[in-house]
Structure formats: structure tokens, C-alpha cells
């Protein structure tokens, strides 16, 4: 997969460091969690799709770490940085053994097809 990202040479030298550091703390928080936990759900308050993913994991008996990045009116810039980092357009972002598997629909599909267990066992 080759996802287009603006080449650094097309950024003015005066803003390169700013762009590189933009909300890096949020990205590092997620990276730390996915290295420490088998399943990580990255979400936001009051999002029904985040709730669906977490409920599906709970019903399947899958323990998971949950990271909350604000709600509809807060921390949207940090969430946007996570979207740009992963390329995934919505929340939740569900990681299994460090791999982004998608959101609520993808979690539900993997559970229904009994594929999530295989990802966790490998």
C-alpha cells in the first residue's frame, strides 16, 4: 500500500518541525498502548460506534485497553492527527496485536467469522 503524503521537500523548512511534532503525544500514547496490550480500542466519548465495538469485544470475552480522545466538542485536533497517522477515517480505531483492523463493523465481522481468535492466537 502506498498512501499519498505530502513530501517533506514540499514543506517550507520553517514549518517542518512543527508538522513533524503536531500532536505526537497522542500518537505516542496509542503506540505505547498497542505495544502493551493485545487489543486496543481508540475512541471518543458519546460515539455509538465506539460503544458497538467495545460491546462486541466484551460479548466475545476479549479484554481490551480503551483510550479516549475527547468527545464531539473537544480534542478534535488530536483525533485528526490519529486519523492522519493511521489513514483510518473514523472512530473507533481497533488494533489487534499492533495491527489496525478497522472499526466497529470490522470487529463485528471478524468476531462473527471467528477470525478474531486467530489474530489473537498468532
Positions of PLM-derived features:
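Non-catalytic, surface beta->alpha helical segment in thiol-disulfide oxidoreductase systems
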Residues: 96-122
Amino acid at each position: 500500500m502506498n498512501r499519498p503524503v505530502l513530501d517533506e521537500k514540499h514543506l517550507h523548512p520553517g514549518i517542518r518541525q512543527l508538522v513533524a511534532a503536531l500532536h505526537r503525544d497522542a500518537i505516542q500514547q496509542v503506540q505505547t498502548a498497542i505495544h502493551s496490550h493485545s487489543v486496543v480500542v481508540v475512541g471518543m466519548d458519546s460515539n455509538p460506534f465506539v460503544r458497538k465495538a467495545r460491546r462486541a469485544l466484551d460479548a466475545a470475552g476479549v479484554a481490551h485497553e480503551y483510550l479516549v480522545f475527547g468527545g464531539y466538542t473537544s480534542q478534535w485536533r488530536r483525533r485528526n492527527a490519529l486519523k492522519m497517522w493511521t489513514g483510518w477515517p473514523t472512530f473507533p480505531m481497533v488494533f489487534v496485536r499492533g495491527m489496525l483492523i478497522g472499526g466497529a463493523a470490522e470487529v463485528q465481522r471478524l468476531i462473527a467469522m471467528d477470525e478474531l481468535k486467530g489474530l489473537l492466537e498468532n
